[in-house]
């Protein structure tokens, strides 16, 4: 799998100074975490899950979550589980024919997760799926906290599954988890610090099992009876942005964990109250004013602004609930040529000092920015480096056509 794999070779050469790396499910975990990008959620009740997964992978999705939790009514859980088990079995069968070679219907590889409700459900699904679990990268764990011991119970269930997989097939790839931070214990101010401390402790003790940490902004907002409009970003909702800041402070340090951006809920047009958040000049310079209008009509300017703020606050990738969001997240995850040269400049001078940047427009201080440079180079491997004259408008145009 590779980001922007749908682009032609000439288009890739035009857009990228350094193309995204080819990835596999066996790639280094830090690279896979950085490469998650737009993680597209899909309810497990979809009537043709396999078709949906194949279609979205072909369109550029690199990570998907099949959801058995909040997107599924309680009464529909048994049917959703059966549907999921059948879909994973079909995907597994299509990956290899009886001779062990890929079949003609083999879907593009992507990171596929299942969002479960309870540790017991995780264990039950694993038993029902058997070898079909090979198509998964892991599980998404809701309302992750360890004050009640819930986090450890989920991790114990994961260990049971991985032990069984290794016993059945020595060398089997271990499954990992992506916890979602959305529990009221972590949201409310009086319990937040102690809860985050406990979360960090259990994550650190089980670091090899953790791919990335996700933020559940919908549950955070609902804890206060709030919901942001399409004219606002999650960072305008101060009580929620304060929680995000504390999460990054505790878990997002250089020796911490990859943390993904919260979901953007809006995808249809409607009456607007505030001015659009996309300047017209970058689109005019690229002769793409029509693209700007398309983004505004679909209410995607707010998403673009929120992605910028996610990145400024140390978050990588984003949870998305509509396929139209995927190309925007990925286009805005490409590293600029300027940032790439800065990262190379800084990482090559670990002894310290300061010097003008390669673009001669800022001061690069070598020691303070080592962690930023290292992170930027990992992201460059995942999403590529834009060519010197390529802007995010060019990447958006190529991604959305």
At which residue positions do the language-model features occur?
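Expand to "…catalyze enediolate/carbanion chemistry for C-C bond making/breaking, isomerization
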Residues: 1-401
């Amino acid at each position: 799998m590779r980001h922007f794999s749908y682009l032609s070779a000439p288009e890739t050469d035009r857009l990228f100074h350094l193309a995204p790396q080819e990835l596999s499910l066996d790639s280094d975990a830090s690279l896979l975490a950085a490469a998650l990008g737009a993680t597209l959620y899909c309810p497990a009740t979809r009537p043709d899950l396999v078709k949906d997964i194949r279609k979205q992978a072909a369109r550029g999705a690199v990570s998907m979550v099949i959801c058995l939790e909040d997107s599924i009514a309680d009464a529909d859980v048994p049917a959703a589980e059966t549907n999921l088990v059948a879909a994973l079995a079909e995907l597994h069968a299509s990956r290899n024919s009886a001779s062990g070679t890929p079949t003609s219907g083999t879907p593009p590889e992507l990171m596929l997760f299942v969002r479960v409700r309870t540790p017991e459900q995780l264990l039950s699904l694993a038993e029902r799926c058997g070898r079909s679990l090979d198509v998964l990268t892991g599980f998404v764990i809701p309302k992750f906290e360890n004050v009640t011991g819930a986090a450890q119970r989920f991790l114990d269930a994961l260990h049971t599954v991985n032990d069984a997989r290794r016993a059945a097939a020595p060398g089997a790839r271990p499954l990992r988890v992506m916890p979602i931070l959305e529990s009221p214990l972590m949201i409310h101010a009086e319990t937040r610090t102690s809860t985050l401390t406990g979360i960090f402790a259990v994550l650190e003790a089980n670091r090899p099992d953790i791919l990335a940490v996700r933020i559940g902004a919908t549950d955070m907002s609902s804890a206060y009876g709030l919901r942001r409009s399409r004219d606002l970003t999650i960072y305008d909702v101060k009580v929620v942005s304060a929680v995000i800041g504390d999460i990054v402070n505790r878990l997002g340090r250089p020796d911490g964990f990859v943390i993904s951006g919260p979901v953007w809920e809006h995808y249809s047009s409607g009456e607007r109250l505030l001015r659009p958040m996309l300047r017209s000049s970058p689109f005019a310079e690229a002769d793409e004013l029509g693209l700007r209008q398309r983004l505004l009509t679909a209410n995607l300017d707010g998403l673009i602004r929120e992605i910028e703020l996610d990145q400024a606050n140390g978050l990588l990738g984003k949870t998305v609930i509509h396929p139209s969001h995927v190309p925007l997240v990925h286009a805005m995850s490409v590293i600029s040529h300027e940032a790439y040269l800065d990262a190379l400049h800084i990482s090559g001078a670990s002894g310290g000092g300061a010097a003008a940047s390669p673009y001669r427009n800022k001061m690069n201080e070598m020691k303070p920015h080592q962690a930023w440079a290292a992170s930027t180079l990992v992201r460059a491997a995942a999403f590529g480096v834009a060519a010197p004259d390529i802007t995010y408008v060019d990447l958006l145009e190529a991604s959305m056509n």
